[in-house]
Amino acid sequence: SRNEMALKVIVYFVTAPNEREAVLKGADYFYVPPSGDVLVNPEATMGLAKIMHLLGISWTMSSKCFDGANYGLFTGDDAAMKADNKAYIEEAKRLKIKHMIPGECGHAYRIFKYMMEKQQWWGDLPFDIANVLEFTAGLIKKGAIKLDKIRNPNPVTYHDPCNFGRSCGIVEEPRIIMKAACADYREMTPSGSKNWCCGGGGGLSAMDTILDFRMNVAGKKKTEQIKETGATFVAAPCANCKRQLTQLMEHHKMDVKIGGVHDMVFNAIIL
């Protein structure tokens, strides 16, 4: 399909020449990013690719299942949500992987870990599931990778996506990464599970028909939070948040770039 062709072209572009040999089956890790982290914001995927290359870890992606976003969850269609999820599980089994790593997408991780795995939709699975933030934070804590924070010298902050922070309790892991990778990390107030929503959650960020509401009402508190930090970069591990925050910064004429947590790893990792 055209989607598969597009994915293959982009993955070819963002990987080094010596990394372009496809791993089809038997890889240790199966990486499932949101499509935005391949098509729009590849730096996040490139950050993980550098880690895997450095440590000699075998990993793969699928041209059949390459978007961790689950649109059944977005639209409230439970049957579609489970069907979408099952396709990824069948692909993971076909690839004979040992670990599944959902990328910087909180609602994808919420479905894989807290809905599918814990409720055993498909019974016991022959692989474990840990999101990319847990994976990288664990490597930093063990000293397996080294980051040069001087390569990210400008003030940065972290936005807690609702699904990661409130629904899944992933709060400390991204901060471990950001503090190790950035020379000037600044915290929002409030933060963690009490951080303000970006104003574009639940797919609202895709609705430009209500742009004025999103920019001036739903996103008002988040804009104020970012401004108070003085940061010039906001890490937001969520495709919805990235779009909403990018539009907020443009609308309010703030010179702030939006990206992912692994964008900082991509810059800072010592190979």
Explain the meaning of each model-derived region.
Residues 1-118:
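Iron-sulfur-cluster electron-transfer modules
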Residues 1-8, 222-247, 267-271:
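Short Fe-S-cluster ligation motifs
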Residues 34-36, 64-75, 103-110, 159-168, ...:
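Local cysteine-cluster metal-coordination motifs and their immediate loop/turn environment
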Residues 62, 141-145, 151-211:
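Redox- and metal-dependent alpha/beta enzyme cores, enriched for Fe-S-associated oxidoreductases
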Residues 76-81, 208-215:
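Short, flexible loop segments at the rims of nucleotide/cofactor-binding pockets, characterized by
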Residues 85-87, 213-232:
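A short, acidic, amphipathic alpha-helical segment used as a generic capping/interface helix at domain edges
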Residues 111-115, 178, 245:
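Hydrophobic packing residues within well-ordered alpha-helices of enzyme cores
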Residues 121-150, 190-193, 250-271:
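Short, flexible loop segments at boundaries between secondary-structure elements
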